[in-house]
């Protein structure tokens, strides 16, 4: 009697979920084969554990109809770089994630959603053929290199929760970008927001220290008049004077809202002699082309009919009335204008004068 030997078992290097079904395989290609899903029918791919090799990355770009891709590098999943060692860096010299180009007859490729956890650095060339992607989650990236996302023509949502450094031109050309999450950023590089036409609302965290000439106001189409910026830092960052040029117009001024109690520090960058406890001139609250607002305060405007250059402003804690000393300061500072323009009698709750006098 002979003894039947068992068939040799395929070595498992990767576990992946393909169109909702989890499979093991010696490689990404073998895992797709075992799933029973034809390669041109794969629309969703999550790599759960194992090792992603250069061969796997080369195969990835052959999945022509892929729409969603997720990979979370960490204890259970390694990304093997070009040098054969594990890496958390995407660049043309370490590891490149490249997707399939658009199919013949299509206006764009199929990929729309990308999640890459555990990646700590991304540089130009680290992602390829990603221009069709609408949503990118890279929550662990700390360093974003120059022009890293410059080809994101369809990119609408970008999560860079842990990023500290944003390189020059990092988002240049992301004209559809509407939502950008940066909870730890310290430096924004030159040109990083050029041609981000749809991004008219931005929150910068308490960690922000340096804003270079990011060219936030430069658009290919339209403009960002009326943009709303929020800065959570109580200490004002260093800002290049041209960083927000072009975001404000006479009728639609762009604003920057700062934390309660931080207004004086921001105004001091503009005019060290200005006193936020009193009435301020228009130029005093123009912080790098953005008009200052303070969390927890309301801005009371004194509209001068002789021109916006003569407008004056007071910040009043929300729910409180304007104090007599601020009114006195207004009349003292605006004496000349009051004599020249009889319409300027005092404060009114409406710009056209039809409201109540304060």
What are these model-derived regions, one by one?
Residues 1-8, 293-358:
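Secondary-structure capping and domain/repeat boundary segments
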Residues 2, 7, 213-295:
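Leucine-rich solenoid repeat scaffolds
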Residues 12-22, 43-52, 65-93, 108-121, ...:
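Structural signature of tandem-repeat unit edges
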Residues 45, 57-60, 202, 229, ...:
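Extracellular/surface recognition and adhesion modules
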Residues 56-65, 226, 354-358:
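Short, surface-exposed polybasic-and-hydrophobic patches located at secondary-structure transitions
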Residues 59-62, 82-91, 99, 104-106, ...:
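A structural signal for leucine-rich repeat
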């Amino acid at each position: 009697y002979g003894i039947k030997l068992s068939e040799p078992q395929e070595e498992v290097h990767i576990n992946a979920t393909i169109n909702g079904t989890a499979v093991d395989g010696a490689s990404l290609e073998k895992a797709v084969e075992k799933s029973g899903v034809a390669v041109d029918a794969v629309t969703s791919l999550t790599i759960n554990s194992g090792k992603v090799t250069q061969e796997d990355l080369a195969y990835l770009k052959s999945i022509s109809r892929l729409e969603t891709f997720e990979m979370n590098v960490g204890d259970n999943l390694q990304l093997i770089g070009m040098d054969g060692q594990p890496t958390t860096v995407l660049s043309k010299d370490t590891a490149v994630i490249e997707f399939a180009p658009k199919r013949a007859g299509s206006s764009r490729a199929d990929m729309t959603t990308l999640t890459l956890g555990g990646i700590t650095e991304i540089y130009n060339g680290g992602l390829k053929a990603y221009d069709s992607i609408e949503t990118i989650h890279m929550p662990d990236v700390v360093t974003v290199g120059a022009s890293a996302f410059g080809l994101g023509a369809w990119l609408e949502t970008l999560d860079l929760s842990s990023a500290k450094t944003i390189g020059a031109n990092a988002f240049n050309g992301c004209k559809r970008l509407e939502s950008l999450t940066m909870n730890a950023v310290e430096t924004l590089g030159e040109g990083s927001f050029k041609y981000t036409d749809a991004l008219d609302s931005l929150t910068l965290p308490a960690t922000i220290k340096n804003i270079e000439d990011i060219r936030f106001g430069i658009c290919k189409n339209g403009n960002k008049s009326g943009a709303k910026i929020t800065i959570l830092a109580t200490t004002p960052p260093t800002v290049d004077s041209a960083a927000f040029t072009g975001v404000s117009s006479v009728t639609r001024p762009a604003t920057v809202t700062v934390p309660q109690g931080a207004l004086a520090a921001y105004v001091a960058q503009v005019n060290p002699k200005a006193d936020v406890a009193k009435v301020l001139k228009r130029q005093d609250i123009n912080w790098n082309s953005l008009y200052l607002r303070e969390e927890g305060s309301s801005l009371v405007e004194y509209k001068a009919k002789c021109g916006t250059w003569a407008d004056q402003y007071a910040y009043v804690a929300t729910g409180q009335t304007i104090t007599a000393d601020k009114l006195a300061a207004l009349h003292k500072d605006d004496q000349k204008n009051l004599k020249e323009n009889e319409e300027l009698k005092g404060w009114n709750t409406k710009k056209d004068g039809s409201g109540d006098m304060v």
